């Protein structure tokens, strides 16, 4: 008996069914590194239009977390997809290396500077620590398949970068944006330094909530203002509300809104001044039963009326400020210019000076009556005692409210006026210019524009000075008496920058002023001891990196991509500095992603046990699963992750991998140079499959171009699961396995599979980089083929249907519907035990005239499309079964006639009629011993 198995074209490939990614990926990475893949990509893109994504530097401290993974994977997907779209995409990763978190870590290792160790040694220890942290994070980023110039990253502590940061400061000064002043800034008592806006977090804190009386200096004058002479009884007070009693010693005024209506109100046995809209709420809060309005005036009528400070021997004026609202409180705002931005601004208009009572360590200075030497938060209770003692405390409660905290120490911070260096938002029209530049940028998602616009419109001047050891120094000299900058400041800055370029920032601290100032000036000028805000470091990388590095060819940055918290962080600082120095935004597009949460929408927290560690994912599942999860998510909102979600990504991965494996296995023995069939000679279904791939590719390219990666994944899954997996790949198995190996029927099919595989691997590469690289190595080799898929552009060999194709896409879409209806009835027949597999079935399709005419075009090949042994078409009028879910079609399933062919598994009535091949059907005889069956459609 003949063994017909050897006459079949069974699929065969070395491409494994299981990804085993955790094991295979490191070997691929080694190959990428050994062969300098990043450089190969760069060389392949020479001369093409550039696309520059400037990497926002993560902080060089600690292990990477899942948010880092999301950020870097999104960037990598963009860079790889832009390469495939025909761009030159240099990617230089970077790190933020100066600043407080590193100082704190190093202090824990070597002690504080100038105590156990010199400042110079401390800086070197910080540099060494940061370098070590960079190496650890770098290894993790590389493990995720991120391509970039990892051997030459930018570090803000690189000597040349430090020098460029100093030069950016010079441009800020040259353009007139820098000034020195005493203004309230966020001040961390633990850091002993000012904080940037982006270094402030808001957490719940329990604070005293107090209503405080400021007695009228001249009650008769107040009565007169309210046209309430002789009305009511008892003392008159202006009532303020605050949650920071410690700021009352610094009170210098009470702010009111000129447009609001204020009332003099009988409050029990006393009279108080309140804004009209809040009288009822204050009455309720204080617990006063009887209230009577004695008079009412606009706020502007009360300007400069005097009230007594609660416990100090001076009076404070009522001053006008638009910052006063009726959202809460009393409509009269306690104003301490040392401790609030609005307080400072409004006091400045009235030439009210600051009190200067709080020192750098957060304690009241020795000359502060009642509270000398007390820490500000410690003094709260003492202030309350004093208020009670003098009868000024109207009401005390304790409330939990949102309060600013230091991002590093997690401790409450204060607003405190200190002499600092600022970039002025109004100086040289910087604010207006920046607001104009925001409009020229594409913000993705679009709400980002309104967000940063509001932030820029309302932000205070930028305090860029810090009182730290590990940071880029503000390499300036100021006059000992006038505090003015040296007249040759710009020249000096450049001279120092050159020294820093050679020896790093320590060159400044080692510098003898005589070397740059000469002996006479060195006597009259001193070094500024401050360092720059680290947001100045990273914010100036548009100059220190993009403008400075040769691979960017002087091109401007196309995109910044970071988490949504960077609107007030890196996006803001970069915009401010670039506008101040270059007169334009540093980016053309800004893309933001949300924060990672668990599947219930909760933040990652060790206490909740919901933390997903990236390394654990790639060690167990592989980095490609992590990458697929990131790409599958709509990153514009919160990004949910959990083990269940990652398992779901794993299921999607297996579907894509299985599709790729099917393609590769069925390309066994196919040589494109020898076996490729011309499009016009291909079988109709194969031509349609290639046209489906072209349509999918167009959708995928558009989605990549618009950074809609979840759409890419959805389209990829639809193509693999629906158009290919449940239709085309199912149908072609019979033709692929049973026809002659070199027949047109089979080579046409393999041609389609080859085109599809060449396209599919490129679609996958930006997301499933490791798997795409693996697939690429198993594809049939073509002369001149690149070694890596990452140097390739999207496949150009796909083609669409033409007018010459009688069976157009609309036709095949109808066939898909017919097949879906047939499958539904076949499945029911399986459940009813009428048949086992579809090949045991004979289907009769009762169709209306339109559907019948369509089906008849396939002739005898309809059964191959339906994957049944027999298919008969009859008029709908003859149906003895009901119409199904497709109007105009009724499907009847019966057991197929004849016997099962052991070679093709189809049932046939002619088995045994062929002398030499008596055990197989006539079709198989033709494919084994004859010229081979002819196919036209499927």
Curated annotation (Swiss-Prot):
Residue interval(s) of motif 'HIGH' region: 58-68
EC id: 6.1.1.5
Catalysed transformations (reactions): tRNA(Ile) + L-isoleucine + ATP = L-isoleucyl-tRNA(Ile) + AMP + diphosphate
GO biological process, one term: isoleucyl-tRNA aminoacylation
Record-linked CDD domains: Anticodon_Ia_Ile_BEm, IleRS_core
Residues annotated as binding Zn(2+): 901, 904, 921, 924
PROSITE patterns: AA_TRNA_LIGASE_I
Gene Ontology molecular function, alphabetical: aminoacyl-tRNA deacylase activity; ATP binding; isoleucine-tRNA ligase activity; tRNA binding; zinc ion binding
Family annotation (InterPro entries): aa-tRNA-synth_I_CS (IPR001412), aa-tRNA-synth_Ia (IPR002300), Anticodon_Ile_BEm (IPR033708), Ile-tRNA-ligase (IPR002301), Ile-tRNA-ligase_type1 (IPR023585), Ile-tRNA_ligase (IPR050081), M/V/L/I-tRNA-synth_anticd-bd (IPR013155), Rossmann-like_a/b/a_fold (IPR014729)
Classification via SUPFAM superfamilies: Anticodon-binding domain of a subclass of class I aminoacyl-tRNA synthetases (SSF47323), Nucleotidylyl transferase (SSF52374), ValRS/IleRS/LeuRS editing domain (SSF50677)
Localization, UniProt: Cytoplasm
A Pfam family the protein falls into: Anticodon_1
Residues bound to L-isoleucyl-5'-AMP: 562
Cofactor binding notes: Binds 1 zinc ion per subunit.
Residues where ATP binds: 606
Cofactor: Zn(2+)
Chief location of this protein within or outside the cell: cytoplasm
Keyword terms, alphabetized: Aminoacyl-tRNA synthetase, ATP-binding, Cytoplasm, Ligase, Metal-binding, Nucleotide-binding, Protein biosynthesis, Zinc
Domain notes: IleRS has two distinct active sites: one for aminoacylation and one for editing. The misactivated valine is translocated from the active site to the editing site, which sterically excludes the correctly activated isoleucine. The single editing site contains two valyl binding pockets, one specific for each substrate (Val-AMP or Val-tRNA(Ile)).
Subunit structure: Monomer.
Function recorded in the entry: Catalyzes the attachment of isoleucine to tRNA(Ile). As IleRS can inadvertently accommodate and process structurally similar amino acids such as valine, to avoid such errors it has two additional distinct tRNA(Ile)-dependent editing activities. One activity is designated as 'pretransfer' editing and involves the hydrolysis of activated Val-AMP. The other activity is designated 'posttransfer' editing and involves deacylation of mischarged Val-tRNA(Ile).
Family: Belongs to the class-I aminoacyl-tRNA synthetase family. IleS type 1 subfamily.
Annotated NCBIfam families: ileS
Protein name as catalogued: Isoleucine--tRNA ligase
């Amino acid at each position: 008996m003949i063994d017909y198995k050897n006459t079949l074209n069974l699929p065969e490939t070395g491409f494994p069914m299981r990804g085993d990614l955790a094991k295979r990926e490191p070997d691929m990475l080694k190959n990428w590194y050994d062969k300098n893949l990043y450089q190969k990509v760069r060389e392949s893109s020479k001369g093409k239009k550039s696309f520059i994504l400037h990497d926002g530097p993560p902080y060089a401290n600690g292990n990477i977390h899942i948010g880092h993974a999301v950020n870097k994977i999104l960037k990598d997907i963009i860079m790889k997809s832009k390469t495939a779209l025909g761009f030159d995409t240099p990617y230089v990763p970077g790190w933020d290396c100066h600043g407080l978190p590193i100082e704190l870590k190093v202090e824990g290792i070597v002690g504080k500077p100038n105590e156990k160790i010199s400042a110079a040694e401390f800086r070197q220890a910080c540099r060494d620590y940061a370098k070590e942290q960079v190496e650890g994070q770098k290894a993790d980023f590389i493990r995720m398949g991120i391509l970039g110039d990892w051997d030459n990253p930018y570090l803000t502590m690189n000597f040349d970068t430090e020098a460029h940061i100093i030069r950016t400061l010079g441009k800020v000064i040259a353009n007139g944006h820098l000034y020195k002043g005493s203004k309230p800034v966020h001040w961390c008592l633990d850091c002993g330094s000012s904080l940037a806006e982006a270094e402030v977090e808001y957490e719940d804190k329990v604070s005293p909530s107090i209503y405080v009386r400021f007695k009228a200096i001249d009650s008769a004058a107040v009565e007169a203002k309210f046209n309430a002479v002789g009305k009511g009884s008892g003392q008159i007070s202006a009532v303020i509300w605050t949650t920071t009693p410690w700021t009352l010693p610094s009170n210098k005024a009470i702010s009111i809104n000129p447009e609001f209506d204020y009332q003099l109100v009988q409050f029990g046995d006393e009279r108080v001044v309140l804004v009209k809209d809040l009288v009822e709420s204050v009455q309720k809060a204080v617990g006063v039963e009887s209230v009577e309005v004695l008079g009412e005036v606009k706020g502007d009528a009360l300007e400069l009326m005097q009230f007594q400070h609660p416990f100090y021997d001076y009076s404070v004026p009522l001053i006008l400020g638009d910052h006063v609202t009726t959202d809460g409180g009393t409509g009269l705002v306690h104003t301490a210019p040392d401790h609030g931005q609005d307080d400072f601004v409004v006091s400045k208009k009235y030439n009210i000076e600051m009190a200067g009572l709080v020192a750098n360590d957060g304690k009241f200075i020795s000359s502060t009556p009642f509270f000398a030497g007390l820490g500000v938060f410690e003094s709260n209770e003492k202030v309350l005692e004093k208020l009670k003692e003098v009868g000024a405390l109207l009401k005390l409660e304790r409330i939990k409210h949102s309060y600013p905290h230091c991002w590093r120490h997690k401790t409450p911070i204060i607003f405190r006026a200190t002499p600092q260096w600022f970039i002025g938002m109004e100086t040289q029209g910087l604010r207006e210019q920046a607001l104009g530049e925001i409009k020229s940028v594409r913000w993705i998602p679009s709400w980002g524009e309104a967000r940063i616009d509001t932030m820029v419109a309302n932000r205070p001047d930028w305090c860029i000075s810090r009182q730290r050891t590990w940071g880029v120094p503000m390499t300036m000299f100021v006059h000992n008496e006038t505090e003015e900058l040296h007249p040759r400041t710009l020249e000096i800055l450049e001279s120092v920058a050159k020294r820093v370029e050679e020896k790093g920032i320590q060159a400044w601290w080692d510098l003898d002023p005589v070397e740059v100032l000469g002996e006479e000036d060195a006597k009259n000028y001193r070094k500024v001891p401050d360092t720059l805000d680290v947001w100045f470091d990273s914010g100036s990388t548009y100059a220190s990196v993009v403008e400075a590095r040769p691979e960017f060819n002087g091109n401007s940055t196309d995109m910044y991509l970071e988490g949504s918290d960077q609107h007030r962080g890196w996006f803001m600082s970069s915009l401010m500095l670039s506008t101040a120095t270059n007169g334009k935004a540093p980016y053309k597009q800004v893309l933001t992603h949300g924060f990672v949460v668990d599947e219930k929408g909760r933040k990652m927290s060790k206490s909740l046990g919901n933390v997903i560690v990236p390394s654990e994912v790639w060690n167990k599942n592989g980095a490609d699963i992590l990458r697929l999860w990131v790409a599958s998510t709509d990153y514009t909102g919160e990004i949910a992750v959990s083990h269940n979600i990652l398992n779901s990504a794993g299921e999607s991965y297996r579907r894509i991998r299985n599709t790729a494996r099917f393609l590769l296995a069925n390309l066994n023995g196919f040589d494109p140079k020898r076996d490729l069939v011309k499009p016009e000679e291909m079988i109709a279904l194969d031509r349609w499959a290639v046209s489906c791939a072209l349509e999918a590719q167009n959708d995928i390219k558009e989605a990549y171009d618009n950074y809609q990666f979840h759409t890419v994944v959805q389209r990829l899954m639809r193509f693999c699961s629906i158009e290919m997996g449940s239709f085309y790949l199912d149908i072609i198995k019979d033709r692929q396995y049973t026809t002659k190996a070199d027949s047109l029927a089979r080579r046409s099919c393999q041609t389609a599979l080859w085109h599809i595989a060449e396209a599919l691997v490129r679609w996958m590469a930006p997301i499933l980089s490791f798997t795409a690289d693996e697939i690429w190595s198993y594809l049939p080799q073509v002369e001149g083929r690149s070694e890596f898929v990452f140097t390739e552009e999207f496949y150009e060999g796909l083609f669409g249907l033409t007018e010459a194709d009688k069976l157009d896409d609309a036709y095949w879409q109808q066939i898909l519907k017919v097949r879906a209806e047939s499958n539904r009835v076949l499945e029911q027949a399986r459940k009813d035990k009428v048949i086992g597999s579809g090949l045991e079935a004979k289907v009769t399709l009762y169709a209306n005239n339109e559907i019948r005419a369509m089906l008849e075009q396939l002739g005898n090949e309809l059964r191959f499309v339906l994957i049944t042994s027999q298919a008969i078409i009859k008029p709908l009028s003859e149906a003895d079964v009901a119409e199904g879910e497709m109007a105009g079609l009724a499907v009847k399933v019966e057991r197929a006639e004849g016997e099962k062919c052991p070679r093709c598994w189809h049932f046939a009535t002619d088995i045994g009629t062929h002398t030499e091949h008596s055990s197989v059907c006539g079709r198989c005889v033709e494919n084994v011993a004859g010229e081979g069956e002819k196919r036209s459609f499927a």
